[in-house]
Structure formats: structure tokens, C-alpha cells
């Protein structure tokens, strides 16, 4: 197995919970609480929409995941959890 030249040890100082997406337990919310307004982008594993929470009229971003392996979805969710609150993250 080859070793990455860049950021090979990036997770060494992080706790296992930060990078272990296979152990992630996903808590799915209620889909009926949200309404899609318009499409804002797409990626390899999902399409991204501007949305609204119908319970409180708050704007939100809705990421609709494409049908891919559960492992890839868990990895995507873990990355988004780690990015939450960062710069330019909605």
C-alpha cells in the first residue's frame, strides 16, 4: 500500500470519533418538516437544494443523497459534521 504524500498523518492527533465514519450511527430527521425551494448545486454523492423548515420558516440547505453504498454516505455525513460551523459552511 502506498502512503499519501500530502496530509498522510492528518488524523493522528484527532480522536477516533473524528475520523471513524464506519462507527457512525446516523439519526435521520423527519423529511416532512422540510420543503425544497430551489437547486443550488450537486456533487458526486448528492444534490444540494435551498430549502425551508415548514415548522418555523427558517431557511436551510437540503442535501439529497444519491443511492450509493452506505459506507460512502456515512463518510459524507461524518465529513459534513466535522465541517459544521466552519468558514463558508451553511
From Swiss-Prot:
InterPro entries assigned: CK2_alpha, Kinase-like_dom_sf, Prot_kinase_dom, Protein_kinase_ATP_BS
Pfam families per the UniProt record, alphabetical: Pkinase
GO BP terms: inflorescence development; photoperiodism
Keyword tags: ATP-binding, Nucleotide-binding
Entry annotated with the keyword Nucleotide-binding: yes
UniProt binding sites for ATP: 40-48, 63
Biological role stated in the UniProt entry: The Nipponbare allele of HD6 contains a premature stop codon, resulting in a truncated non-functional product.
PANTHER family with a match to the protein in the record: CASEIN KINASE II SUBUNIT ALPHA (PTHR24054), CASEIN KINASE II SUBUNIT ALPHA-1 (PTHR24054:SF56)
Similarity section: Belongs to the protein kinase superfamily. Ser/Thr protein kinase family. CK2 subfamily.
The name this protein goes by in its record: Inactive casein kinase II subunit alpha-2
This protein's encoding gene: HD6
Amino acid at each position: 500500500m502506498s502512503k499519501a504524500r500530502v496530509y498522510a498523518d492528518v488524523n493522528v492527533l484527532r480522536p477516533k470519533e473524528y475520523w471513524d465514519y464506519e462507527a457512525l450511527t446516523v439519526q435521520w430527521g423527519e423529511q416532512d418538516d422540510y420543503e425544497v425551494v430551489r437547486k443550488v448545486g450537486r456533487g458526486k454523492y448528492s444534490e444540494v437544494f435551498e430549502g425551508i423548515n415548514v415548522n418555523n420558516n427558517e431557511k436551510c440547505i437540503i442535501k439529497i443523497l444519491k443511492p450509493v453504498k452506505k459506507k460512502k454516505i456515512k463518510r459524507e455525513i461524518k465529513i459534513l459534521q466535522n465541517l459544521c460551523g466552519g468558514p463558508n459552511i451553511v
